[in-house]
């Protein structure tokens, strides 16, 4: 909004010229979202605590100490993140940019699904929540709209025919595999998979939000690079007109994440719930699809992939062979069962997220 107000005045007022710079507006979005999370965090947590009573239900068959230590902690803290992200983005981004709206659409849509899931868990005091099939149908419907919207946007901006339905292979120069209509299925799987992978990761205080911020920072940089002709040509990556504005959304996400972490740091005063984890994961997946770096998401978000795969392996192994591969899934609970302290798991997973992010950034140069 501020961009549309001040950018046209740049020729007459030197200060207004700052609003033409994506980096300046990203900083503004980050600070705005962070302040919102700081200021509204305490009253929102108090309101959630009063409304929810017993808070988020804790799995009785899970980690024993969680039943005692985490019982009564309110959930739906994702509202705080979404508030900061939305206000920060809408205030500082170019609202004529389609990619901004695509990411906002998925973030909000997945947030609604997550809210329904959280609401059912809290009101019924069960860990079951929203039915898995209904949940997936809703997620795939939202993801399909986003993928179609993104490919249409790419075509309207004049990308080379076929690029909009192609997959870029990291570490290989100009290697784009056009999979045609299958891209719509692939894109949906990326977005839905990302949303649920982050959701699986959100099981310990601070575990999910920091890797999400790290991934957002990484993809913000990549979006900025592919959104500039000069950088894209120098690094020999495909150019995506308008993608640079996604950096502003990423900045808002990081700012809101920092503010949320203030309240989610151990011992957590609030959990983000599915309201936050599904929406943030969906946002990361959508960004990856929009800037044609879907496979890089598997690297940068490798921690999320590991968490999701651990659950899939656990379920498949038990159904097929009647045996569990892990002591408990997702895998962070496996390490808890082995006796690792919660802060040890969280910090080590953060370190892994940083390493994977650096590898993901290296794909820009190593080709």
UniProtKB/Swiss-Prot annotation:
Xref: PROSITE patterns: MRAY_2
Subcellular location: Cell inner membrane
GO terms of biological process kind: cell division; cell wall organization; peptidoglycan biosynthetic process; regulation of cell shape
Required cofactor names: Mg(2+)
Signal sequence residues: none
Single GO molecular function: phospho-N-acetylmuramoyl-pentapeptide-transferase activity
Presence of keyword Transferase: yes
InterPro entries documented for this protein: Glycosyl_transferase_4 (IPR000715), PNAcMuramoyl-5peptid_Trfase (IPR003524), PNAcMuramoyl-5peptid_Trfase_CS (IPR018480)
Pathway membership: Cell wall biogenesis; peptidoglycan biosynthesis
Keyword Transport tagged: no
Reaction(s) catalysed by this chain's protein: UDP-N-acetyl-alpha-D-muramoyl-L-alanyl-gamma-D-glutamyl-meso-2,6-diaminopimeloyl-D-alanyl-D-alanine + di-trans,octa-cis-undecaprenyl phosphate = di-trans,octa-cis-undecaprenyl diphospho-N-acetyl-alpha-D-muramoyl-L-alanyl-D-glutamyl-meso-2,6-diaminopimeloyl-D-alanyl-D-alanine + UMP
Membrane topology value: Multi-pass membrane protein
Alphabetical UniProt keywords: Cell cycle, Cell division, Cell inner membrane, Cell membrane, Cell shape, Cell wall biogenesis/degradation, Magnesium, Membrane, Metal-binding, Peptidoglycan synthesis, Transferase, Transmembrane, Transmembrane helix
GO CC terms of this entry: plasma membrane
E.C. no: 2.7.8.13
Membrane-spanning ranges: 28-48, 75-95, 96-116, 134-154, 175-195, 206-226, 243-263, 271-291, 295-315, 344-364
Any Pfam family hit: Glycos_transf_4
Family from the record: Belongs to the glycosyltransferase 4 family. MraY subfamily.
Function: Catalyzes the initial step of the lipid cycle reactions in the biosynthesis of the cell wall peptidoglycan: transfers peptidoglycan precursor phospho-MurNAc-pentapeptide from UDP-MurNAc-pentapeptide onto the lipid carrier undecaprenyl phosphate, yielding undecaprenyl-pyrophosphoryl-MurNAc-pentapeptide, known as lipid I.
HAMAP family per record: MraY (MF_00038)
Name by which UniProt lists this protein: Phospho-N-acetylmuramoyl-pentapeptide-transferase
Taxonomic path: Bacteria, Pseudomonadati, Pseudomonadota, Alphaproteobacteria, Maricaulales
């Amino acid at each position: 909004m501020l961009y549309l107000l001040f950018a046209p005045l740049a020729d007459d007022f030197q200060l207004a010229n700052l609003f033409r710079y994506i980096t300046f507006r990203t900083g503004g979005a980050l600070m705005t979202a962070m302040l919102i999370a700081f200021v509204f965090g305490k009253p929102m947590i108090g309101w959630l605590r009063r409304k929810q009573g017993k808070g988020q239900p804790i799995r009785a068959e899970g980690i024993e100490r969680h039943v005692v230590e985490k019982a009564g902690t309110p959930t739906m803290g994702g509202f705080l993140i979404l508030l900061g992200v939305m206000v920060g983005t809408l205030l500082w981004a170019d609202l004529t940019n389609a990619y901004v709206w695509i990411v906002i659409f998925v973030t909000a849509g997945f947030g609604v699904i997550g809210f329904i899931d959280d609401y059912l868990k809290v009101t019924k005091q069960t860990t079951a929540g929203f039915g898995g099939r209904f949940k997936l149908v809703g997620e795939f419907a939202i993801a399909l709209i986003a993928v179609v919207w993104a490919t249409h946007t790419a075509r309207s901006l004049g990308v080379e025919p076929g690029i909009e339905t192609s997959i870029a292979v990291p570490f290989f120069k100009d290697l784009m595999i056009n999979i045609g209509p299958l891209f719509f299925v692939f894109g949906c799987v990326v977005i839905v998979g990302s949303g649920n992978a982050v959701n699986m990761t959100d099981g310990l205080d601070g575990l999910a939000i920091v890797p999400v911020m790290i991934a957002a920072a990484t993809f913000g940089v990549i979006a900025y690079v592919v959104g500039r002709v000069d950088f894209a040509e120098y690094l020999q990556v495909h150019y995506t007109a308008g993608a640079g504005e996604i950096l502003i959304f990423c900045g808002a996400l990081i700012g809101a994440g920092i503010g949320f972490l203030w309240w989610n740091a151990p011992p957590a005063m609030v959990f983000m719930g599915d309201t936050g984890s599904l929406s943030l994961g969906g946002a990361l997946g959508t960004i990856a699809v929009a800037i044609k770096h879907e496979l890089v998401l598997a690297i940068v978000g490798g921690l999320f992939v590991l968490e999701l795969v651990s659950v899939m392996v656990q379920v498949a192994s038990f159904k097929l062979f009647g045996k569990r591969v892990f002591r408990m899934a997702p895998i962070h609970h496996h390490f808890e069962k082995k006796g690792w302290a919660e802060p040890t798991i969280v910090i080590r997973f953060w370190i892994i997220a940083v390493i994977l992010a650096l590898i993901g950034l290296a794909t820009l140069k190593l080709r």
